[in-house]
């Protein structure tokens, strides 16, 4: 199955299995390189899917207008401070 045909969840699970195998350090060099390349492809695919999902998520602003979701604003709201402010 190609990377594009896999669901995000399956791609992420495969990426986790690759990371475990590479971290164990007991794979032959050639297999390790192949796993690394596959993993990098999965990372790119997952990032692209996450970005597409982020763009689809929107929130209603105070004036009722739809505004893009901003992770920094969400994290700041959970931390109790304005976005961009470090505590």
From Swiss-Prot:
Instruction: List cellular component terms (GO).
Output: cytosol; exodeoxyribonuclease VII complex
Database matches in InterPro entries: Exonuc_VII_S, Exonuc_VII_ssu_sf
- Asked if Transport is a keyword of the record, the answer is no
Its top-level enzyme class, in one word, is hydrolase
Record-listed E.C. numbers: 3.1.11.6
What Gene Ontology molecular function terms does this protein carry?
A: exodeoxyribonuclease VII activity
Q: Which cysteine residues pair off into disulfide bonds? A: none
Keywords recorded for this protein, A-Z: Cytoplasm, Exonuclease, Hydrolase, Nuclease
Localization of this protein: Cytoplasm
According to its UniProt record, what is one Pfam family this protein matches?
Answer: Exonuc_VII_S
Keyword GTP-binding appears in the UniProt entry: no
An example of a Gene Ontology BP annotation on this entry? DNA catabolic process
Catalysed reaction(s)?
A: Exonucleolytic cleavage in either 5'- to 3'- or 3'- to 5'-direction to yield nucleoside 5'-phosphates
Subunit arrangement? Answer: Heterooligomer composed of large and small subunits.
Listed HAMAP family = Exonuc_7_S
Q: Which NCBIfam families match?
A: xseB
What does this protein do, in the record's words? Answer: Bidirectionally degrades single-stranded DNA into large acid-insoluble oligonucleotides, which are then degraded further into small acid-soluble oligonucleotides.
Q: Which family does it belong to?
A: Belongs to the XseB family.
Quote the protein name from its UniProt record.
Answer: Exodeoxyribonuclease 7 small subunit
**What is the originating organism of this protein?**
Solidesulfovibrio magneticus (strain ATCC 700980 / DSM 13731 / RS-1)
Q: What is the lineage of its organism?
A: Bacteria, Pseudomonadati, Thermodesulfobacteriota, Desulfovibrionia, Desulfovibrionales
């Amino acid at each position: 199955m190609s990377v594009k045909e896999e669901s995000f969840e399956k791609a992420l699970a495969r990426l986790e299995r690759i990371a475990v195998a590479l971290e164990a350090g007991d794979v032959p060099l050639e297999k390790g390189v192949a796993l690394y390349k596959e993993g990098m492809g999965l990372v790119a695919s997952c990032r692209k899917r996450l970005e597409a999902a982020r763009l689809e998520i929107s929130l209603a602003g105070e004036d009722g207008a739809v505004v893009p979701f901003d992770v920094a604003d969400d994290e700041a709201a959970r931390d109790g401070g304005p976005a961009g402010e470090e505590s």
